[in-house]
């Protein structure tokens, strides 16, 4: 007697979100990238179509970041020039996206003006042809000014702008609507707040296919299991037809992995941990691969060797296991 293999088919799928815009679409990108569209749990090709592979955005900053030497070494020749830094990420390290973090805008730091921030975004747009993710410094008032100006200056480029949070989502949502960009909806590892924020943004008439969820992750050893659980619930909600949980997910892997002491502490202090030149790279790569299994669509990363390892893993995971 033939054995019937049961498959758990879903009645819905993750929303597709298009990043970037070509010249014909009103932008200047060489191509667009589509994320989302999954009709099954992560890489369950046997249960539904996984139409778009996860992508990696490499981080570029508008100031010299306070990173450990092992992380700065691949970029020492370009770290003072965001445009050249972005070019190196794309041309040498194969970044799918550029993740431009405007930390220089921080009033407690370099306090770059709005005009300086806009100039940096334009510099990076001119330097590379891939789509951009642009986020502010984290200061609510300054980000309000900076991101509105960036949205206007890059109108038509279909950027992914962030971060919109429950207490300050209105101005960025309005800017994304007017200037035709996508938005990152960030919530603090709380699925109820995540869903509510998506509802609030959508009620302002920004389409669901212009929203990407940042659930706030923890790095390896620092809450990643809770992040994994929240992301699983988001994916299950999407597959069960919950439109307000159906957006693609973005994860700040590099930031969370490299802030862990275990990633960058010198071997002289912790000889049993192994060389920091290898340890930090593995910390970032393993954080990323774990989050892929939870349903990440966009990984924001830092070290090129970690990026290479994760790209190889994505290649393997995208080979169909359908039967």
Swiss-Prot record:
GO terms for molecular function: cobalamin binding. Signal peptide: none annotated. The keyword Membrane does not apply. InterPro entries: Ac-CoA_synth_d_su_TIM-brl, ACDS_complex_subunit, CO_DH/Ac-CoA_synth_dsu, Dihydropteroate_synth-like_sf. GO terms for biological process: carbon fixation; one-carbon metabolic process. Keywords: Carbon dioxide fixation, Cobalamin, Cobalt. 5-methoxybenzimidazolylcob(I)amide binds at residue 188. It holds the Pfam family CdhD. It comes from the Bacteria. Heterohexamer composed of 2 subunits of AcsC, 2 subunits of AcsD and 2 subunits of AcsE. Acts as a methyl group carrier in the anaerobic acetyl-CoA pathway (Wood-Ljungdahl pathway) of carbon monoxide and carbon dioxide fixation. This is Corrinoid/iron-sulfur protein small subunit. It comes from Moorella thermoacetica.
